[in-house]
């Protein structure tokens, strides 16, 4: 965004800014609270500020998006298409459970990783999101649910480590300004050379989830074309460095594709690869999409794969994506809308 925006600024930065508008420094704290706690879209909403100031500054960009489309699944999951200042559309998902509210945020418009099984990858890459555009997604969900967001996962559109600078800025704000603990933040990556190492140097207590999806290089390249530039052994070496530096357990994500990477031999090979790792494996049965021919394995095949990992002392669980009825798996709702008539803004 060419013009400066307020969302993403710290309390000292907002205090400095408010003084440039002719207001006393204490107004900075008020602005900070209205921005991050009340989630305003417009400065004219700040009723504790003088009317003349609100009229003068009402059009100054806060940095909020508009909800272009929203869909709710029977399980309560809410999928949002958010329209950015330049008209581009991104996806966000709010996932409620009994004691928490998790937001799945996007870090890019589209994605350059081009994973064969991902709807977002089929749409190509447009641009990186700025930090405030990531923070905005969390505030949007928090306001819509009228419930405090407890967890944020960077598992929406885009490759977070390809946009590391803005992702780190958003993490700082989510932690310090919105009050979400670092251990409640998860960054997912398919792997970008040297960026896991760069993330480790930040000394954060977040969770890193590595999208592995295959036990060997050849199979990984066949479903993740960009993996040709990042051999699986180099990826795992960086993962070991990450654990050594951060003392944090890794998560490995593994999407199960029927007949592709879900065979018993694949499970045994994966167990061998991850032996000795301080990690947990999340097995994710595939969410079918219209653009690609992959299918979800049956429950028996899933359970056999899981049992083989357990027999090799690998910590593992099966994670079923919520919100399938709302096309909430990454990329699905946006892709479906692009094939249909434009949705009514609401």
Curated annotation (Swiss-Prot):
Sites where the protein binds [4Fe-4S] cluster: 111, 115, 118
Active site (UniProt): 91 (proton acceptor), 330 (s-methylcysteine intermediate)
One Gene Ontology MF term: 4 iron, 4 sulfur cluster binding
Cofactor: [4Fe-4S] cluster
Entry keyword set: 4Fe-4S, Cytoplasm, Disulfide bond, Iron, Iron-sulfur, Metal-binding, Methyltransferase, rRNA processing, S-adenosyl-L-methionine, Transferase, tRNA processing
Cofactor annotation comment: Binds 1 [4Fe-4S] cluster. The cluster is coordinated with 3 cysteines and an exchangeable S-adenosyl-L-methionine.
Disulfide bonds: 104-330
PROSITE patterns on file: RADICAL_SAM
EC number(s) reported in the record: 2.1.1.192
Localization (cell): Cytoplasm
GO cellular component: cytoplasm
Gene Ontology annotations of biological process type: rRNA base methylation; tRNA methylation
Domain Radical SAM core: from-to ranges: 97-325
Catalytic reaction(s) noted: adenosine(2503) in 23S rRNA + 2 reduced [2Fe-2S]-[ferredoxin] + 2 S-adenosyl-L-methionine = 2-methyladenosine(2503) in 23S rRNA + 5'-deoxyadenosine + L-methionine + 2 oxidized [2Fe-2S]-[ferredoxin] + S-adenosyl-L-homocysteine; adenosine(37) in tRNA + 2 reduced [2Fe-2S]-[ferredoxin] + 2 S-adenosyl-L-methionine = 2-methyladenosine(37) in tRNA + 5'-deoxyadenosine + L-methionine + 2 oxidized [2Fe-2S]-[ferredoxin] + S-adenosyl-L-homocysteine
NCBIfam families: rRNA_mod_RlmN
Reported function: Specifically methylates position 2 of adenine 2503 in 23S rRNA and position 2 of adenine 37 in tRNAs.
Note: Reaction proceeds by a ping-pong mechanism involving intermediate methylation of a conserved cysteine residue.
Protein name stated in the entry: Probable dual-specificity RNA methyltransferase RlmN
UniProt source species: Picosynechococcus sp. (strain ATCC 27264 / PCC 7002 / PR-6)
Gene of this entry: rlmN
């Amino acid at each position: 965004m060419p013009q400066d925006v307020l969302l993403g600024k710290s309390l000292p930065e907002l205090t400095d800014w408010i003084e440039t508008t002719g207001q006393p420094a204490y107004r900075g704290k008020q602005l900070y609270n209205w921005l991050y706690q009340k989630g305003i879209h417009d400065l004219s909403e700040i009723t504790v500020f003088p009317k003349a100031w609100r009229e003068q500054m009402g059009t100054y960009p806060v940095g909020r998006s508009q909800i272009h489309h929203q869909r709710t699944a029977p399980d309560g999951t809410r999928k949002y298409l958010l329209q950015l200042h330049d008209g581009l559309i991104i996806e966000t998902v709010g996932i409620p459970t009994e004691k928490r509210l998790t937001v799945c945020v996007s870090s890019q418009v589209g994605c350059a990783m081009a994973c064969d099984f991902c709807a977002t990858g089929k749409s190509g890459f447009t641009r990186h999101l700025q930090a405030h555009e990531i923070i905005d997604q969390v505030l949007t969900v928090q306001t819509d649910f009228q419930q405090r967001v407890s967890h944020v996962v960077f598992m929406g559109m885009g490759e977070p480590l390809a946009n590391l600078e803005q992702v780190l800025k958003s993490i700082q704000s989510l932690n310090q300004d919105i009050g979400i603990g670092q251990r409640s933040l998860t960054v997912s990556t398919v792997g970008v050379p040297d960026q896991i190492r760069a993330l480790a140097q930040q000394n954060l207590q977040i969770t890193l989830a590595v999208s592995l999806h295959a036990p060997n290089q050849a199979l990984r390249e066949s479903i993740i074309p960009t993996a040709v530039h990042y051999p699986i052994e180099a990826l795992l070496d960086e993962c070991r460095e990450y654990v050594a530096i951060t003392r944090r357990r890794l998560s490995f994500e593994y999407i199960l594709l029927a007949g592709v990477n879900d065979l018993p031999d694949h499970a045994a090979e994966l167990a061998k690869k991850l032996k000795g790792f301080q990690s947990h494996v999340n097995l994710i049965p595939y969410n079918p999409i219209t653009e690609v021919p992959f299918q979800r394995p049956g429950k028996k095949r899933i359970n056999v794969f899981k049992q083989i990992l357990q027999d090799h002392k690998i910590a593992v669980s099966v994670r079923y994506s919520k919100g399938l009825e709302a096309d909430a798996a990454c990329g699905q709702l946006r892709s479906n809308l692009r094939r249909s008539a434009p949705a009514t803004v609401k």
